[in-house]
UniProtKB/Swiss-Prot annotation:
Region of interest called Disordered, as start-end residue ranges on this chain: 1-35
Residue span, Deacetylase sirtuin-type domain: 139-436
Entry EC no(s): 2.3.1.286
Cell compartment(s), UniProt: Nucleus; Chromosome, Centromere; Chromosome, Telomere
Annotated protein name in UniProt: NAD-dependent histone deacetylase sir2
Pfam families in UniProt: DUF592 (PF04574), SIR2 (PF02146)
Single GO MF annotation: histone H3K14 deacetylase activity, NAD-dependent
C-alpha cells in the first residue's frame, strides 16, 4: 500500500518534557485533531456563516505595526531554519514566553472561548500552528504576472489541475462557502451546523436532512463551462497530467476528458448505492425523489420475499401460490435500505484512486499546479498543494483569496471563466478554446458571458489580479 504523504503529524519532542508545568502531559493535554480543527477555523479566510469563530487571518499588515511584523517574520525565519524543537526551546524555555504570547506574536488572536484556558493547555494549538507554518509553501519570487503564467503554460508538460465548486458557478450551480453559497443558504434555513448535511452518521440516523436540501445541489444542466473546456484543452495539448475535482456534478466528463485523467475526490451524483445491501444504480434514478425532497429507498432489498405454500394432495406436484394474506407475511417484509448518492460524506474515506495517485510519486513530476474555484478548506484534498514540490509554480483562480498558503500568481474574479478566456487570449489559444465552447455540450449562457464581457483588469503587487466586468463589477 502506498504511503500517505498527507500524514504530516508532528511528534512529541524532548523539549516538551522540559516545560516547567507539572500538570502538562503531551499525551493528554489536548486533541491534535481538535487543535487542527481550531486552526482551520482561525487561519482560514472568513467567508461564510458556518465558521463560528470570527478571527483575524494570518496576514493582515494593516492591523499591525511594523515592529510586530518584523518580530513575527524573525520568529518564522527561526522556526524554518532551526525547526520545531529548537523554536520551543528558545521561546518557551529560554525566553519563558507564555504560549498565548507566542501565538499572538505569530498572528493568532484567540477567540473569547479560549481566553479562560490555562496557558499550558494551549500548547497543542501552538504545536499545530507551528506544524502548519513549517509546511506552508513560500511563494516563488520570479513568477508574478500574466506573462509569467502564459510562459509557464506554454512550457508545461505535466499540469495538475485542482478544481472546486467555483468552476461551475457560471452555470448557476451553487458553490459552498461564498456569502451566497450552499452553506449560507442552509444556515438561513435554520440548519445550525450546515456541514451536518454531509455527515455520514447524521445521514444514517436522519436521511431526511440530506434529502430536504439536496435538490439545490442536483445538477440542473448537463452542459460544461469555458473553465471546464480549458481543462479539456490542456489534455488535447498533451499537457494535462491529472485533474483532481472536488465537485459532485460530474460535468468534467461532459467535455470528453479521459477517465484516466480524472480523480473525483468527493465522488459524484453519477451513481448511487444502498447503504444496506450495497445495490448500485444510476444516480438519475434518485433525481425525482431528490427534487421532491423525498427520501429514496432501495428497490432491491426492499422487495418483500414471496411466501409460497404447496397445495394439492400429490406430494410430487409442484403447485405453489403466494400466501399474501398470511398473518406472518407482514413480518416477512424487508425494511428497504436508504439510497445514498455516491458522494463522499464527512466521516467517509475518500476513494482509493485519490490516495493511490497521491502516493504513487507521479505528482513529483508536476511542473505546474492550477487551482480553480476552490477555497482549499477541506482536507485531505486541500493538502495536495503540500504534496506538489514547493519549487513547482502554483496558480490560483477563484472569487476570494486564500490565507493559509502562498500561490505564485492569484487571479480573483466573480467568474473563473473570465480569467480562463483572458489567459487563453494572451497565450494564443483563444480559437481553440472557442471551438470547444462552440460545441452543443457547452453552456451557451456561460459561453456568452465569458467571451463577450468587457473586462476590467487591475494588478495588485506583487502578483494578484482582480478581474471584473467594466460595467458593474460582475455580470
Amino acid at each position: 500500500m502506498a504511503s500517505n504523504p498527507l500524514d504530516n503529524n508532528m511528534p512529541t519532542t524532548p523539549v516538551e518534557e522540559k516545560i516547567p508545568v507539572a500538570s502538562y502531559s503531551p499525551s493528554s493535554s489536548g486533541s491534535s485533531s481538535g487543535a487542527s480543527l481550531l486552526v482551520d477555523i482561525m487561519c482560514g479566510s472568513k467567508e461564510t456563516e458556518d465558521e463560528e469563530v470570527d478571527s483575524d487571518e494570518w496576514d493582515k499588515p494593516e492591523t499591525e505595526n511594523i515592529s510586530d511584523l518584523d518580530e513575527r517574520s524573525e520568529m518564522v525565519r527561526y522556526l524554518r531554519a532551526s525547526g520545531y524543537a529548537k523554536f520551543l526551546e528558545k521561546y518557551l524555555i529560554e525566553e519563558e514566553l507564555p504560549v498565548r504570547s507566542i501565538l499572538k506574536k505569530l498572528g493568532i488572536n484567540l477567540p473569547s472561548a479560549l481566553e479562560e484556558f490555562e496557558d499550558i493547555d494551549l500548547l497543542p494549538l501552538l504545536k499545530e500552528v507551528l506544524k502548519r507554518e513549517v509546511a506552508r509553501r513560500i511563494k516563488l519570487p520570479h513568477f508574478n504576472t500574466f506573462e509569467d503564467v502564459v510562459n509557464l503554460l506554454k512550457k508545461a508538460k505535466n499540469v495538475v489541475v485542482l478544481v472546486g465548486a467555483g468552476i461551475s458557478t457560471s452555470l448557476g450551480i451553487l458553490d459552498f462557502r461564498s456569502d451566497n453559497g450552499f452553506y449560507a443558504r442552509l444556515a438561513r434555513h435554520g440548519l445550525s451546523e450546515p456541514s451536518e448535511m454531509f455527515d455520514i452518521h447524521t445521514f444514517r440516523e436522519n436521511p431526511e436532512i440530506f434529502y430536504t436540501f439536496a435538490r439545490d445541489l442536483l445538477p440542473e444542466t448537463n452542459h460544461y463551462s469555458p473553465s471546464h473546456a480549458f481543462i479539456r484543452l490542456l489534455e488535447k495539448k498533451n499537457k494535462l497530467s491529472t485533474l483532481f475535482t472536488q465537485n459532485i456534478d460530474n460535468l468534467e466528463k461532459k467535455t470528453g476528458l479521459s477517465d484516466n485523467k480524472i480523480i473525483q475526490c468527493h465522488g459524484s451524483f453519477a451513481t448511487a448505492t444502498c447503504i444496506k445491501c450495497k445495490h448500485k444504480v444510476d444516480g438519475s434514478e434518485l433525481y425525482e425523489d431528490i427534487r421532491n425532497q423525498r427520501v429514496s429507498y432501495c428497490n432491491e432489498c426492499g422487495k418483500p420475499p414471496l411466501k409460497l405454500r404447496r397445495v394439492g394432495q400429490n406430494k410430487k406436484e409442484k403447485h405453489y401460490f403466494s400466501d399474501g394474506d398470511s398473518e406472518s407475511s407482514e413480518d416477512d417484509l424487508a425494511q428497504p435500505g436508504i439510497m445514498k448518492p455516491d458522494i463522499t460524506f464527512f466521516g467517509e474515506a475518500l476513494p482509493d484512486s485519490f490516495f493511490n495517485k497521491v502516493g504513487s510519486g507521479e505528482l513529483e513530476e508536476t511542473d505546474l499546479l492550477i487551482c480553480i474555484g476552490t477555497s482549499l478548506k477541506v482536507a485531505p484534498v486541500s493538502e495536495l498543494i503540500s504534496v506538489i514540490p514547493p519549487t513547482t509554480p502554483q496558480i490560483y483562480i477563484s472569487r476570494t483569496p486564500v490565507r493559509h498558503t502562498q500561490f505564485d500568481v492569484n487571479f480573483l474574479s466573480p467568474y473563473c471563466d473570465w480569467v480562463i478566456v483572458e489567459i487563453c487570449k494572451r497565450a494564443g489559444w483563444l480559437n481553440e478554446l472557442q471551438a470547444l465552447c462552440d460545441l452543443p455540450e457547452c453552456h451557451s449562457g456561460s459561453k456568452t458571458r465569458a467571451f463577450e464581457t468587457d473586462l476590467d483588469i487591475k494588478f495588485e503587487e506583487p502578483s494578484t489580479y482582480h478581474i471584473t466586468s467594466t460595467t458593474n463589477g460582475s455580470c
